Amino acid sequence: IEKLEPKRELMQRVEETAKEGAIISTNTSGIPLHSISEGRSEEFKERFVGTHFFNPPRYLKLMEIIPTENTDPEIVESVRSFGERVLGKGGVIAKDTPNFIGNRIGTFAGMQSARYAFENGYGIEEVDGITGPLIGHPKTATFRLNDQVGLDIAVGVAENLYEAVPEDESREELKPPEKLEEMQQKDLLGNKTGAGFYKRDKREGKTVFDVLDLETFEHHPAENPEIPVAKEAQEQGDLAARLQFLIAKADEDRHARYVRDTLLPYMAYASRRVPEISDTLEDVDHAMEWGFAHQTGPFRTWDLLGVRETVEKMESMGIEAASWVKEMLQAGNDTFYKTENGTELQFSPVSKEYEPVREDPMYVSLDRLRDEGKELASNDSASLLDLGDGVLCLEFHSKGNSIDAQIVEMGNRALEELERDDVVGLVIGNEGRNFSVGANLGEMVHSLKNGDLDQIETSVEALQDLLMAFRFVPKPVVSAPHGQTLGGGLEVCLHSDRIVAAGETYMGLVEVGVGLIPAGGGTKEMARRLVSPPLHAAPNTPPLPFLQKAFEQIALAKTATSALEAKEMAFLTENDRIVMNADHLISAAKREALDLADGYTPPEHANNVYAAGRTARAALEMGVKTMQWAHYASEYDGVIAGHVARILTGGNLSLPQWVPEEYLLNLEKKAFLGLLKQEKTHERIEALLKTGKPMRN
């Protein structure tokens, strides 16, 4: 309950019952902590701290930690460490001020940008078209974000903040614009009421999002307006280049002007709130990066634009940066962050000196290793780095970290390095948004258009050979997946000795969506992991229930929604580890490789995959026919599923038997190449490349 008296009463009861030394925390989003702890003992106040999470807490990394002047600093650090290690959060230290860091800065940005749009005639689609990934913000951009959060929540937070900060020089900017209040009165609150700035509808069997007319408050079909400057900015390259381009274009282009006239006030406001809400720039930046999914917070964004040039631009527009920013520039310091002797420093508005950025001892930065000369080899798609202590790291950095010929090439280079006496193991990991979205379809389409099936066959064999080499190499291989880990990316993991997965890892063998089957050993691994173990344990066990599960996971392209679900699907084993903080993956995987290296013995080559034979295959195929009769599967779905059934059961084997892994790999390759010759597979591949969505034909 976000009311002071009930919280005080609760804290009195907590003090009476809590064991000695227990940390006591409240997750208030705005009530001052010192008010909640008023009347409690000094001992209570020393172990009392605020913890504020951002919704949805599963996906947003931010945890604001709010000590009072009485809180023991060791308690603060313990809570921060617990949040980072156990909960997978990023902890920032906020002062006990209204709305702390994220909602103080975020409310200003949200209300100011909405007001500017309304007062200057910008359409909802226009604003969302230029305030998303183009400027380093999430796809929800501005108005879709309001719909997601709920307009009543956004307006309520702004109104409460307005009342709580009478001394804020920008207080009037915190007031919700009248348009938002009118929308609230009309119950246009966003997703929770079914309509807000957007309204979800269905027309001609397709989901559409109609857009609100801010004059009539009626929804109309989306117009998808052309924004030429957005396209031009996108072509500039990275975030710094895109933002610099837009700021430079602002005087002549209204869309670029919107970016400038909302971005600069937001950065200036953030500077004026330091050190009121936080003593460090990194905590303010992290609050916006982790709580609002911004690529860079206000001060890192300012560095991208050039601090001195941006302050001059602000002054010409009548925007006031904090006095400490001007003092920093006058002292000859031109950036908020800089690196000296391998250590990243941040300017402190309190000490007026550069101080080290807080480092997470569990975080390994691959870019820093590269800067330190630890890169052993590199090409356009992958690199091989030295993690120290005899452990190497194979890093993917192709588009989407998709598996291509250059990744295979670098994988083979990693195998060569593993032959060295001073190398004890290999980690396969990266710091991209996703571990790997699967095979490089563009590379495959290029070969198809040239009629070069031989090249595709060579590529399939090369991938199979590499992954089998990872599986049997006499030194441990540990994969560290996170995010989407699909198709060939998952097959890389399945052939590792151990997987150290982020909690938010989404694994699946999804090849049927493009009219193919897993051909890098994925189908074989499902037979080995799901079907074979129960038959090893009890030879008379009926294999069909286990075959059915493996078959459905592949034929229906099932994807795990978390690492825990991936364990249920046998993508992860009981020996694999789940790490809640993705920043700790490389470090944890390295430790795992070192642990395995001590007395490591590779798996034996053996007839270790159970092939159930033709009778089991017929049972699986009958299940497909049933789905087709019920119109749950197309005719071509049945063709693909038939190949999956054939591989899982061992092809044309008349009787059940144990076979080597290579036997199923050969079946995979033949099925894959056969499907590649089919026009309907070509249609599925082209549809996915064009629309980003799988096609059913």
For each feature predicted by the language model, list its residue ranges.
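N-terminal glycine-rich phosphate-binding loop for ADP-containing cofactors
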Residues: 1-433, 442-462, 466-475, 482-486, ...
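Short glycine/serine-rich donor-binding loops of glycosyltransferases
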Residues: 490
